[in-house]
Amino acid sequence: GIPVFEDTPAATPAAGYAGSVIGRFTSDMVVGGHKISGFSVFNGSYSVPVTPQSPVPLASAGNAFNFVRVGTNNRIVVKCSSAVVALAGSQNPQSFSWDAVNDQLIPVSLSPDAITFNATLIQVDTNGAVVSYDDVTGFATWNTAANVAVIQI
């Protein structure tokens, strides 16, 4: 999963859409006071194509992926640093940060641009599958030798 933000649109009849605005959370959003609202998930996404070159579901503009909100007690799988793997067996819940450059979960960071949130660390694995995206070809493949964590948000 990747962190997402959620904003309530302005109360105008000309907005042209109903519902909240959801988008990918980035580290520069911390300055504006945004918080992580949830994480994107693959399961339950419909009509997202996979191809032999790109076996990971990819959605273009206008398509949708599901997301789960923080506080719903859902368990999600996220890419994590080896420092998070080292936390296996420690007490829960814990504070974590999101490394937006490497798109991975890291132990809590005191950096002013850190995206920090609380979660329960359920399980870690050093041989999990995460998405590897190639900016040049536009293909996404599974990296099956990555560190992953199952967290309850």
Predicted feature locations:
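Surface-exposed, low-hydrophobicity beta-strand/loop segments enriched in small/polar/acidic residues
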Residues: 1-153
